[in-house]
From Swiss-Prot:
Species, as recorded: Agrobacterium vitis (Rhizobium vitis)
GO molecular function: DNA binding; DNA-binding transcription factor activity
Sorted UniProt keywords: DNA-binding, Plasmid, Transcription, Transcription regulation
PROSITE patterns per record: HTH_GNTR (PS50949)
Taxonomy of the source species: Bacteria, Pseudomonadati, Pseudomonadota, Alphaproteobacteria, Hyphomicrobiales
Domain (HTH gntR-type): residue spans on this chain: 30-97
Name by which UniProt lists this protein: Uncharacterized HTH-type transcriptional regulator in the TAR-I ttuE-ttuC' intergenic region
Length: 171
């Protein structure tokens, strides 16, 4: 069972707003839903919530330090994404990816990133050098994380690499 506050330490690192601010009135309802969504998604991605993990809405809300309403809405979004299944009156259960899901994800990723790399190959040399430097930084961060046996750090650097590749190709 996940200890109270474990999400705060492990899963919220990528949330745009600190969750301590979410209890205040200054953050919109949409901001709270987004923060809950990203925190839970990150907990799934980092295996804080592994496949098969079951949690009640109130338990997750308590861990995030927010009311049930944004957590409820975040869970609905996560179910639409196929990451969780809502169990009426019980909470959620984390879905496992099937081998077919993983294969499809990689096929789409390869197609998109191949097109992005082709597009980047056509840009002006000075801009290309900047993009290469960003990609090199992300790659070096991945290597450093592996040397420290830091899987979450490696995943964050890997995500930064892929996001940089696609974002720079889109400009």
């Amino acid at each position: 069972m996940v200890k109270p506050g474990q999400i705060l330490r492990a899963a919220v690192r990528e949330t745009a707003e600190p969750l301590t601010e979410l209890a205040g009135d200054s953050v919109s309802s949409a901001g709270r839903v987004s923060a809950a969504y990203h925190a839970i998604r990150n907990a799934i991605r980092t295996n804080v919530f592994p496949p098969g993990y079951q949690a009640a809405e109130i338990e997750i809300a308590r861990q995030l330090g927010m009311s049930r309403t944004p957590v409820h809405e975040a869970m609905a979004r996560l179910q639409e994404d196929g990451l969780v299944r809502i169990l009426p009156k019980k909470g959620i259960i984390i879905c496992a990816l099937s081998p077919a899901d993983i294969e499809e994800i990689y096929e789409v990723t390869i197609a998109l990133e191949g097109a992005a790399a082709s597009r980047l190959a056509m840009i002006d040399a000075p801009v290309k050098a900047e993009v290469v430097a960003l990609l090199r930084d992300a790659t070096e961060a991945m290597v450093a994380a592996l040397e420290r046996n830091d899987l979450p750090g490696w995943a964050a650097a890997d995500e930064r690499f892929h996001e940089t590749l696609v974002a720079c190709a889109a400009q």
